[in-house]
Amino acid sequence: MVFSLKLIAAILVLTLGSGIAGLPPIVAAPSADQPRDIIRNRFEASGIPEKVVCWGELICESEVLPRFYENRLFWPAWSNSSEPLTIVDGFVHALEDAHHEGLRGADYHLDSIKSLLGELRMPQAGQKRPGPSILADLDLLLTDAFLIYTSHLLNGRVDPVTIRAEWYVKSQKADLVALLKTALDSNDVKKALENATSNHEGYARLRRVLAHYRGIAERGGWGKLVGKQKMAKRDSGERILALRNRLIHSGDFGSKESPEGDLFDDELESAVRRFQGRHGLAQDGVVGPATLEALNVPVEERIRQIEVNMERWRWLPQTLGTRYLLVNIANFELGVMEDSRHVMSMRAIVGKPYQRTPAFNAEMTYLVVNPYWNVPSDIARKEMVPLIKKDHEYLRKNSIRVFSGRNSARKEVDPADLDWSSFTSGYFPYFLRQDAGPKNALGSMKFMFPNRFNVYLHDTPDKALFNRTVRQFSHGCIRIEKALELAEYLLAKDSRWTRETLLESLNVSVDRVIKIPDPIQVYILYWTAWVDEDGTVQFRNDIYGRDKPLAEALEEKPPSP
């Protein structure tokens, strides 16, 4: 299963391990007369079982619940000796509303909990009032449901490691038991769940949009546009009318009525451009193959896309900081964020489909002006050696030098002295380094945030690539459009570095390391659906194929006995 339950258990074991100071151990045998005794007997009958089944439901936290109840001397958490507490109804309503979070109440014992409550409150005619075993079962299910649901709200329902999501952002740790205790003590489960829910504005926006798109689906969604011919200004006919209606349904067309509904007029062209812009397409106002494909994505698929990206928000810590850099891989963009708002943005180039840029975070501490490029060994072996074999002037033309040895023992080698025919894609015992200058692959600057992936931001001499709509050309690092502007921003607190002094340094072909006075977090993330600060819903293609396995994992049923 893909549920992140081991993580939950680890957190809760640490939380509960200390017990309650000053209370003597329970040594009396259970009488099975009260819910408390039944709960105790459930766990003590055969030690701590690998699986605890309650009312036909698998208790997911069977390793943790015994400790939770031991700490409270096995007293029920959700009922008194005869009936459920009022807090239960609030929690049930919250589970019924789990779909607002892109989650399912059924994954948290909702049906069984409601059945038990029904038996307790409305016993069938001729039946005795349900005994304490019903209250015990209800208590165990409610506690398990709360711990699992709050964990999913805080950390996500799916563990990204299990689906190879290439997501390495450091997640948060939370005291779930303390959260439960607070809810019980304050009789306010709603507040406790709010504290567990992602507090990022980006998450809240997607939650609102999820409700809107579900409403579209309930009203029948939007129809599929037939035919493959492109549609452009001054065209007319039934396909144009269908296009207009399609854009009305998704909110891209301002007016629901038009006197010339089957004519591709200026108003319709503007609506097409608006649609293209929020789907990452070239905004030419023409419905070509790419635009038609995006238009024909059904609303149900967009709903799944929204749910997938809400899950990614849950994978993040509750705060990213007041100031940080944010790269959205799927949008090919870098943003400078202050108080969750963009203060600068620029186009970016990310890794090729077979050299994908991972999602992770790290702290940027320095930048380098006029950097050398130490060519990674796999690039040297697989890409450059074949080029050198074809053109013996390749190294000179590209200002690349050859070195042997490592670190202090490294020394330059004359490439003419080497037998290049002996080198293959699997064997090249030398190192290549490209000198600083206009041909350097890193451009004029690189921005460093040490990480295990050896990924960093850098300039590029090939500026024309930023004009492409889809920008997947790198070996995994991120090329940025406005390196000088970013350097100015990062060095603003260092009076020695202004735009002028940076430009002066660029004119000297010597690499120079500059410490960033106020280090900044860098988040490299993967969003295929989000809502802009102005409320515009954005969708992007799943360029690395990461949405599908996550969507499938979210659809999986919870464990069964």
Model region roles, listed by residue range:
Residues 1-4:
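N-terminal secretory signal peptides that target proteins for export/translocation
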Residues 6-19:
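Bacterial N-terminal signal peptides
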